[in-house]
From Swiss-Prot:
Keyword presence, Ribosomal protein: yes
Entry's Gene Ontology cellular component terms: cytosolic small ribosomal subunit
Gene symbol of the encoding locus: rpsC
Protein name: Small ribosomal subunit protein uS3
Family per record: Belongs to the universal ribosomal protein uS3 family.
Oligomer and partners: Part of the 30S ribosomal subunit. Forms a tight complex with proteins S10 and S14.
Length: 233
């Protein structure tokens, strides 16, 4: 029986970047890995309502830099930056080194697999029909410019006695093409009937040129954001 490899893991170093960007010797590696896990768990627990897409952790010269990608930056920052300062202090306590927090806004949450899967799980927990939740997410993603999307739910759908799996796809989702920019995420909906698993694949187009192209795109987006901030001032 054919099994699917994790789409993000397969593309690491080709067109996908790591979520932890640091190098450590053998002595410190386990401690860094453990503190990364604790930081992520802490942030995901604190920022449940902030629609957090991903957390990037860097460790420059005995300090830690955390970049939070979120669809609701206002909730993360808080009134006059109070909330983000509390997060910074807590992260410094967990890791034992000075911490810095950067916040990056996710402009199109409909094209982010993590946010789409969480949206579907929250709808399922509110007893929205699973087919309606799936189709709504697929339509929103295609409207925002996705090349293709596939959504799969599995479990006791609609309270059925026997668990089953259903999926809905629109456009194309080429899982074998390494240059295909596929965003993938998984989440769980805890309903009265049990746990329902949700998987989302979003195909955003092909990236030619590998990691160098990704870095150029990131640099240009940072420059655009800086220019946008200057114009607002």
């Amino acid at each position: 029986m054919g099994q699917k490899v994790h789409p993000n893991g397969m593309r690491l170093g080709i067109i996908k970047k790591w979520n932890s960007v640091w190098f450590a010797n053998t002595k410190d590696f386990a401690d860094h890995l453990d503190s990364d896990y604790k930081v992520r768990q802490f942030l995901m627990k604190k920022l449940v309502k902030a629609s957090v897409s991903r957390i990037i952790i860097e460790r420059p010269a005995k300090s830690i830099r955390v970049t939070i990608y979120t669809a609701r930056p206002g909730i993360v920052i808080g009134k006059k930056g109070e909330d983000v300062e509390k997060l910074r202090i807590n992260i410094a306590k967990i890791t034992g080194v000075p911490a810095q927090i950067n916040i990056s806004e996710v402009r199109k949450p409909e094209l982010d697999a993590k946010l789409v899967s969480e949206s579907i799980t929250s709808q399922l927990e509110r007893r929205v029909m699973f087919r309606r939740a799936m189709k709504r997410s697929v339509q929103n993603a295609m409207r925002q410019g996705a090349k293709g999307i596939k959504v799969e739910v599995s479990g006791r759908l609609g309270g059925a006695e026997i668990a089953r799996r259903e999926w809905y796809r629109e456009g194309r989702v080429p899982l074998h093409t390494l240059r295909a920019n596929i965003d993938y995420s998984i989440s769980e909906a805890h309903t009265t009937y049990g746990v329902i698993g949700v998987k989302v694949w979003i195909f955003k187009g092909e990236i030619l040129g590998g990691m160098s192209t990704i870095e150029k795109l990131e640099k240009s987006s940072i420059q655009i954001k800086k220019q946008h901030r200057k114009n607002r001032k």
